[in-house]
Amino acid sequence: MRALRDSPICLEGIEAIDEGRRAAPPWEAVRPEVVREARAARSGSVGGSGPLGLAQRNLLSFGRQMAGHPAAVVGGVVILLYVMAAAFAPWVVPCAPDEVALSQRLTAPSWTGAFPLGTDQLGRDILSRIIFGARVSILVGILTIAISVTVGVGLGVVAGYFRGPFDRLVSRFTDLLLAFPYLIFVIGAMAVMGPGFWNLIWALSFKGWVEFYRLARAEVMSEKTREYVEAARALGRSNAAIICGEILPNVVHSILVLGTLRMGNMIVLESSLSFLGLGIPPRTPAWGSMVNDGRRYMLTAWWVATLPGLALVVLVLAINLVGEALRDVLDPRLKEG
Amino acid sequence: MATGMGTQTVLQVSGLSTIYPTPRGNVEAVRGVDLALDEGDVLAIVGESGCGKSACLLSIMRLVPHPGRVIAGSVMFQGRDLMKLGARDMREVRGRDIAMVFQDPMTTLNPAFRVGDQIAESLRVHGLLPGFPASLARRSRAREREMVTELMRQVGIPSPETRHLEYPHQFSGGMQQRILIAIALACKPRVLLADEPTTALDVTIQAQVLELMREINETTGTAIVLVTHDLAIAAEFCREVAVMYAGQIVEQGPIDAVLEDPVHPYTRGLLRSIPRLGERKPLTPIMGEVPDLAALGPGCSFAPRCEARRPCCDISQPELVAVDGRRLVRCHARRD
């Protein structure tokens, strides 16, 4: 809670809230004059009740609710650490990730030594390789989910809203894709295309969009029967405006939740493929291939395989914790009044 | 029609017919409905559930849900036949010229947006407020808030300056319906189609909402078509009433005449089945069931339930004819 409140993004709005809280605790009921005063106090910022002001307040309410889930805050901090480390990898690592020091091979972890997390069978620093491996995992997670969401939601919204032959065609195609086990499918695709970063992204996304398609399609179909859609039509809004302006805002929360949870899956899949030697090419450090490297030394040098695996577990756990909290906060059925 | 006010006709519906194809055959939801609405008219359409009241309104707006469709008839509005308009022109008419208020305010408002934004949206759709991105300008935001709070004030929502920032679930049912009426009135429509606007509300709130609609009708001259199954509301609110049965209008005329001296046996039956305060007589329901609209016979569709049934009723459809100069009745057994 404190950590979030002190972050610079939320500070502006917090003032307004704290001003208002003296009068009325639920911030939705903040008296407008109080908010206006608070707003006027921060000169140069947006005034009035326009879209920007609303977006700020919405974000704030969302932040406050997320802060109510301690596990999610921990998860968020962990994810932030991983992302920072990955983004600034060349500057934060103690050694180059591919610097070989055969004389130092299989050094045990020690806080005082040159290699805090030890070295592998070629004497490469494991900490540096884990940090560089985070780049691969995070990028794969973000890119595959971005592609899957774009394709899946785009097709799903159109299919769910207009139905008809397009829906039948795409839905049958997704049924076909779902008939393949995911891992086998991706292994097959990678075996054909060969290892490589972009090949991996395409192989994972090729099936990843199906779930988003089904979710978006089902949500749109159920939202479409709601009266507000009919009312929007009676108001003279076009189909495109109804999809983007009326239905999507009611659907976006479930897509966000699924996207977060699936990102963990994608990262695990990437590691599985790298473990099998089908994912990222061997020169690039990736957690999966590091675990595979250390497999043979499990009994003599446990750290080579265990630590990259631990890095993977912690990241995926953090992502899932945040995903769970998002579901609690964003599900309108659980939302407080 | 029979208002005698000599004002001009705003909406002229003739021969409107709508079907819903089903595996059992075509359900004829609306069968040749004729209506004429003058400026400032208040017309009630009453009837049982499933008699085609709502389908009739949706047909006028060309919003009949797929796979239903209007198969015949015309709706003349400002010299144009709405049934022949292109999709884009029809969207222009919806909301701007003819607005609609729905039954359940809770589900008709979009839960994801603040009510002020939803009212503003209705102004934006028809260009009364600038759309995105011009809507972000400080001046247009101020103007937007001014127009929205003014509309909310008009429909009697207290402290609109605060409440336009609230979400639909923070309002009571009556207030939600007022917001919907504000949305419908935003573009100052010529005709307001109200589909059971008070059914989801409790009785005192019903009266307030009806009073609000009456006020709007009197001050702006907006013609109102009120669909309801409640004859008391029709009697209270409307000058003219059309009774629908099985997709057809069976009796239409000034409200006093129809309620005090109903001619059609169905109207008589409806009136007898309303409980009255202080009377301890048992109610007389209309026996039998609503006919299957997918399998209508050649005769009068009310004949199987009719107390005044004659042999000819099973053979031929009665026409809607004028009776005692003031109203129209569709019955073989009418008095002439």
Q: What spans do the regions from the language model cover?
A:
Chain B
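A short, flexible loop at the N-terminus of ABC-type nucleotide-binding domains that lies
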Residues: 6-10, 19-32, 63-69, 86-89, ...
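Short catalytic/signature loops enriched in Gly
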Residues: 8-9, 158-162, 252-336
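P-loop NTP-binding/switch modules centered on Walker-like glycine-rich loops
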Residues: 62, 193-197, 201-281
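Conserved ABC transporter NBD signature motif
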Residues: 70-81
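Conserved ABC ATPase "signature" region
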Residues: 80-81, 127, 135-162, 271
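ABC ATPase NBD coupling module
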Residues: 82-99, 117, 125, 137-141, ...
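A short, proline-enriched helix->beta-strand linker immediately N-terminal to the Walker B motif
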Residues: 186-190
